[in-house]
Amino acid sequence: MNRTPSLHTKEKKGFIDMHTMWKGSISFGLVNIPIKLYAATEDKDIKLRSLHKEDHAPIKYEKVCTNCEKTLSPDEIVKGYEYVKGKYVVLTDEDLKSLKQEHEEKAVEIVDFVQLQEIDPIYFNRSYFVGPGDNGTKAYTLLREALRSTGKIGIANMTIRSKQQLAILRVYENCIVMESIHYPDEVRSAAQVPGVPDQSNVNDKELQTAITLIDELTAKFEPEKYEDTYRQALLQRVNDKLENKETAVTPDKAPPREDVIDLVSALQASIDRTRRPNRETPAAAPAQAAEPKGAGDKKQKTTRKKASGTS
């Protein structure tokens, strides 16, 4: 029986409350359309935390300087561009802030309209649902229906979170979708792939057999029938361990043992220091040479007696 955990996957069934991730506008000629952006996809990867094997407490990562090995706080860290190995151009917060203000126009500017088939999917990056902003419903509907009627998509420039990107605008179901796409210099050339043969070296029989197999496996695309079997198996394994009570609890924070050890060491060092003058060698204590011989012997015997009485 295939059982998949539901309580522990943090998934909500039914209506999903869309979180507005960006507000701005689409510039379409002289038309300005207020919009809101929403994430169109979500990461379903199962997040596994790294734990200390001995006590199952989560581990943490610290930002450490590779030179002085000092753990750094956020205000001690700056950004830098490595122009050659080990050499950097430092960019201050003021540098980055001024650049952000220059390019963060909160507008998606449509610059061209093209056919979707002209863009290879290798350029596609991330998808966003575009919803109408305040008082933008009519203009939004106009753009959507114009795109639907012409079968065209819009090519646009946009800036989100200080990053300028190229994007397309198209109709998906009854909604406008914006997809960020890569710039040409971000797409590597297929000619750089090693080992790819330049010419075909298959015979007609082999080719026809492969075509027949493709024809037999050809079907209508139904995304619902494709599943992440590894994720399901991992969830099942987690569920089995929960049912068998194979769980671990993060322990309470351990006391700072090193501080205690250091304190004991400091106290012991203090005790040793108080005893050290009584244990000096005769050569290191010339001041006692002026004392009468009997007084020195008597004092030494008294000290030994006290030491033996307290041991």
From Swiss-Prot:
Start-end of Low complexity biased regions: 282-293
Matching InterPro entries: Ku70/Ku80_beta-barrel_dom, Prok_Ku, SPOC-like_C_dom_sf
Domain spans labelled Ku: 26-210
Subunit structure: Homodimer. Interacts with LigD.
Function recorded in the entry: With LigD forms a non-homologous end joining (NHEJ) DNA repair enzyme, which repairs dsDNA breaks with reduced fidelity. Binds linear dsDNA with 5'- and 3'- overhangs but not closed circular dsDNA nor ssDNA. Recruits and stimulates the ligase activity of LigD. Probably involved in DNA repair during spore germination.
Keyword Metal-binding: no
Top-rank taxon, per record: Bacteria
Organism: Bacillus subtilis (strain 168)
GO biological process, one term: DNA recombination
One of the record's GO molecular function terms: double-stranded DNA binding
HAMAP family for this protein: Prokaryotic_Ku
Organism taxonomic ancestry: Bacteria, Bacillati, Bacillota, Bacilli, Bacillales
Protein name: Non-homologous end joining protein Ku
Pfam families per the UniProt record, alphabetical: Ku
SUPFAM superfamilies: SPOC domain-like (SSF100939)
Subcellular location: Spore core
